[in-house]
């Protein structure tokens, strides 16, 4: 890795993340205190169980959350995630990706208890136009145990993530459009963020 060049690119990416947090705060006040440095993912790859032993990633990525908790296991809730790779591809998504079992169960229960509200989110015009449907990666073949197989949202109950995702070509000749484009894309998914934040976790001691 060319360390001097990486350091320059990292500082440029940090500036993007910092500016983006400011733009997101216009419609989502909860991310105002997000630390941009903590939002950025490390360049080092975990190669312990990987066949690809290259030590460094070929992309810059960040996850913006209210509590600086990017990972589902840390209980961070909805994340505004984006990455830029070396080929000029911009990918971004919003929601909860592979949340831990207790959180996943709570989301599924909320779908059942707030079927109308969830349906409204899934029909949101901005969400559908930008992202389409929820990511169905690792979707269950059968309904999860304890849930009605005839429920109107049974296909969504099978999901393991409640996350929307898209990718576009980076406007390399219009770098000043990056943050506005991301902010617009993230705002289009704010209905999903709001709904997920309404999911209540039960007290484990109950």
Roles of regions detected by a PLM:
Residues 8, 13-24, 111-112, 116, ...:
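Long, solvent-exposed, polar/charged low-complexity segments
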Residues 93-143:
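A contiguous pocket-lining binding segment that forms or flanks enzyme active sites
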Residues 3, 7-53:
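Gly/Pro-rich turn-and-neighbor structural signature
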